[in-house]
Amino acid sequence: MSKPPDLLLRLLRGAPRQRVCTLFIIGFKFTFFVSIMIYWHVVGEPKEKGQLYNLPAEIPCPTLTPPTPPSHGPTPGNIFFLETSDRTNPNFLFMCSVESAARTHPESHVLVLMKGLPGGNASLPRHLGISLLSCFPNVQMLPLDLRELFQDTPLADWYAAVQGRWEPYLLPVLSDASRIALMWKFGGIYLDTDFIVLKNLRNLTNVLGTQSRYVLNGAFLAFERRHEFMALCMRDFVDHYNGWIWGHQGPQLLTRVFKKWCSIRSLAESRSCRGVTTLPPEAFYPIPWQDWKKYFEDINPEELPRLLSATYAVHVWNKKSQGTRFEATSRALLAQLHARYCPTTHEAMKMYL
């Protein structure tokens, strides 16, 4: 049996009052750690109550799909989606995100990088989402190798170190790191998998969206390959790393770097400087996260174009909205967005939800 550390033994040999305090602190920390571990590993993330689990593995492809772009593989100008967990069964919002991007960008490769996909010549998993997205010839699903992605970037050593420890927000932090590495290495457009794309985004370069008057958001990024702004983001990611604060490596990082980039103290002072532009909230975040329930409220279909006239893509705030049920054929805003911008996914929802 291994001996306790010398420091712990010295603490326990102290005065009775000191021993009681020491034991209390050790017990509290141990209980707190065990509670978090049990919650994270046993309870896990909330189930998606709005999606059934007896879905078919395949779906007939629609007759009309975007044409196949001529090139193959990651090249500048691609549209990227990321799944940094091991999940390989895209939900309906994930499907709609990719389909809407594919339909609005028929000339582009839409690359869905999934950590859980097998490498080599292995076939794709048999899931409804994989089958549906395979219908679009400009959509390509590829395995995500994080070690390879971070290689030759400031993130490589950080990734090697973080493998050996537990952190509460590791999955979103990995996603934050992956998107800036993708933009640095390949350039193009990055989108979270809870976006619904309304318009072509090809005219946006070196652009990110404003979430509120105080913070930017990296759920959408559009940058040239090896842009210095992304290099600064990677360096800040490592130099000021804190995986225990939600958003510190994502929205807060982008906000910090943009303020340094423009030498400003407030986002209100500048929306564009040194070739990098921030778009107002209505461009990508027309409904604030605090009002996410509005996506499930009925609206008049005639009001939709007016409401979204200044919007490129709609962020649905899946962290808040996941599990919320709605009828695919209803007049809810989200149902109407599905019907208009991802009709193939919408048909599947009507059949299986």
Curated annotation (Swiss-Prot):
Catalytic activity field = a beta-D-Gal-(1->4)-beta-D-Glc-(1<->1)-Cer(d18:1(4E)) + UDP-alpha-D-galactose = a globoside Gb3Cer (d18:1(4E)) + UDP + H(+); a beta-D-Gal-(1<->1')-ceramide + UDP-alpha-D-galactose = alpha-D-Gal-(1->4)-beta-D-Gal-(1<->1')-Cer + UDP + H(+)
The UniProt keywords, alphabetically, are:
Glycoprotein, Glycosyltransferase, Golgi apparatus, Lipid biosynthesis, Lipid metabolism, Membrane, Signal-anchor, Transferase, Transmembrane, Transmembrane helix
Q: How does it sit in the membrane?
A: Single-pass type II membrane protein
Recorded GO CC terms: Golgi membrane
State the organism of origin: Pan troglodytes (Chimpanzee)
Q: Per UniProt, what is one Pfam family of this protein?
A: Gb3_synth
What domain comment accompanies this record? The conserved DXD motif is involved in enzyme activity.
Motif DXD motif covers 192-194
Q: Which SUPFAM superfamilies is this protein grouped with?
A: Nucleotide-diphospho-sugar transferases (SSF53448)
Highest taxon, organism lineage? Eukaryota
Q: Does the keyword Transcription apply?
A: no
The record's principal subcellular location, in a coarse class, is Golgi
UniProt name for this protein: Lactosylceramide 4-alpha-galactosyltransferase
A Gene Ontology biological process in which this protein takes part is:
glycosphingolipid biosynthetic process
Q: What subcellular locations does the record give? A: Golgi apparatus membrane
Enumerate the Cytoplasmic topological stretches: 1-22
Family membership noted in the UniProt record: Belongs to the glycosyltransferase 32 family.
Q: What does this protein do?
A: Catalyzes the transfer of galactose from UDP-alpha-D-galactose to lactosylceramide/beta-D-galactosyl-(1->4)-beta-D-glucosyl-(1<->1)-ceramide(d18:1(4E)) to produce globotriaosylceramide/globoside Gb3Cer (d18:1(4E)). Also able to transfer galactose to galactosylceramide/beta-D-Gal-(1<->1')-Cer. Globoside Gb3Cer is a glycosphingolipid of the globo serie, one of the major types of neutral root structures of glycosphingolipids, that constitute a significant portion of mammalian cell membranes.
Quote the gene name from the UniProt entry.
A4GALT
Residues on the membrane's Lumenal side span: 44-353
Question: Enzyme class, one word?
Answer: transferase
Might you give the EC number(s) for this enzyme?
2.4.1.228
Query: Per UniProt, what is one GO molecular function of this protein?
Result: lactosylceramide 4-alpha-galactosyltransferase activity
The reply on keyword Repeat is no
